[in-house]
Design a protein with these regions (language model features):
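Hydrophobic alpha-helical transmembrane segments of multi-pass inner-membrane transport and secretion
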Residues: 16-41, 245-282, 303-316, 361-368
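Membrane-proximal extracellular/periplasmic loop immediately following the first transmembrane helix
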Residues: 49-101, 114
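Hydrophobic secondary-structure segments that place a key small or acidic residue at a functional site
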Residues: 97-100, 111-119, 130-197
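Mechanotransmission and gating elements of multispan inner-membrane complexes involved in transport
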Residues: 165-252, 258
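Transmembrane alpha-helical interface segments in multi-pass membrane proteins
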Residues: 280-325, 357
Length: 391
């Protein structure tokens, strides 16, 4: 085996430009596949982290009628907070929020919004709710940067909001924008306006009630509470998992095409090599090599393309991958337009398992492709091969 590796290496280096063209193409596959997989892993990690910091915390209780995709359920999506959770709420380990449907009138225009009541002193979310603890002539409110852009509102602007209370009566008041935040989770930003929780309860005549109860830390088990539905972080981030899985399948097709082109070059090189080196093959057999050993020699020779490609890709790919991990890949279009948790700049994450699995898969595929044309050697007549007769 050691001799076969030495011979294979000598033959590859002796082939000159043909070898290095194959190696460069294959090394490009290494770098691109690892980078694109790293982008997907980084997006998954970043999206879930942002959702935990801005929206879901360590899990939630939803009022049983609440459906985030059906605004018509908001009028019934409220209930008294369970007494068993009062201690955790007092300690800041659970943050209650009340969500009601409303209408906002910026510059005389009308737009539907979800009015969210939030405790100004909460510390679970990264929302700047401390800006709700402000003394003003109107109700203090904060909105996201996308909502600010859509509604054409800035800090200090006054705007009218209208809502329908629990008794079915419509009412309206003015709010003043005391803060604008920027986040990567559209469901926290788009179509929502945040005001103090107690003020919203007073407006709606819903004292002590909430729509969502968010925990600071995730626990393996939470008690079942009548009228409330428990949602762990796995359930709340399921949409991200499904999206990443769909994107991964699409990327796999691209990986297959990229590998197919590289493997086609390897296959053609092997076929040409066997065709041109029939005398050499006959000489190996005459010197005592078995057909199996000669097939193994050519297979190792083809497989070594992937080893050399891994070395070459490490030379120029490692600095590129490190640079991308630090500076990130900025999306060419506004990420908020996708309607999902996605940062404008994605930072790839390269795990040891990702790199090792990619290298092993490419080496294995290259070995199989190299062996495929090498099987022809087993059918050759060594005498005819020594004479140089084409077979």
């Amino acid at each position: 085996m050691k001799l076969a590796i030495k011979l294979a290496y000598r033959n590859l280096i002796g082939a000159g430009l043909r070898t290095w063209l194959n190696v460069i193409v294959l090394s490009f596959s290494f770098v691109v596949i690892i980078w694109m997989k790293g982008i997907m892993v980084g997006w998954d990690h970043q999206a879930k982290t942002d959702m935990k910091n801005w929206e879901i915390g360590g899990g939630q209780y939803w009022q049983e009628n609440y459906d985030p995709f059906d605004p018509f359920t908001l009028s019934e999506s409220h209930a008294a907070i369970p007494v068993s959770l009062n201690d955790e709420i007092t300690n800041g380990e659970i943050v209650p929020s009340l969500i009601v449907s409303g209408t906002i009138y910026p510059q005389g225009r009308m737009q539907s919004v979800a009015i969210v009541g939030m405790n100004p002193h909460q510390s679970i979310f990264m929302l700047p709710t401390e800006k709700l603890d402000t003394t003003t002539s109107a109700i203090p409110a904060i909105i996201g940067s996308v909502s600010s852009r859509n509604l054409k509102l800035n800090v200090g602007d006054y705007v009218t909001i209208r809502w329908r209370n629990v008794n079915g009566m419509f009412d309206a008041t003015e709010v003043v924008i005391t803060g604008i935040f920027s986040c990567n989770v559209p469901s926290v930003d788009v179509g929502k306006i945040y005001i103090p929780l107690e003020k919203l309860r007073e407006m709606m005549s819903l004292k002590g009630e909430a729509t969502i109860l968010t925990f600071r830390e995730e626990q393996s088990e939470r008690p079942e509470i009548t009228g409330w539905s428990y949602k762990n972080t796995a359930t709340l981030t399921q949409s991200v998992d499904e999206l990443i899985q769909t994107k991964t399948v699409g990327q796999s097709i691209f990986y297959a095409i990229l590998l197919l082109l590289a493997m086609l070059a390897i296959f053609d090189t092997q076929v040409l090599s066997i065709f041109r080196r029939q005398k050499e093959i006959g000489t190996y057999i005459a010197l005592g090599y078995t057909r199996r050993e000669v097939v193994g020699l050519f297979t190792v020779e083809g497989a070594m393309h992937s080893i050399l490609a891994a070395i070459v890709s490490a030379i120029y790919g490692l600095p590129f991958l490190i640079w991308m991990a630090k500076s990130g890949w900025t999306m060419p279009i506004e990420a908020s337009e996708f309607g999902m948790a996605m940062a404008q700049t994605l930072y790839p994450v390269y795990s040891a398992g990702l790199v090792i699995s990619t290298v092993l898969i490419i080496v294995l595929v290259t070995t199989v492709v190299s062996y495929w044309p090498s099987r022809k050697i087993a059918k050759m007549n060594p005498t005819e091969a020594l004479r140089g007769k084409l077979q």
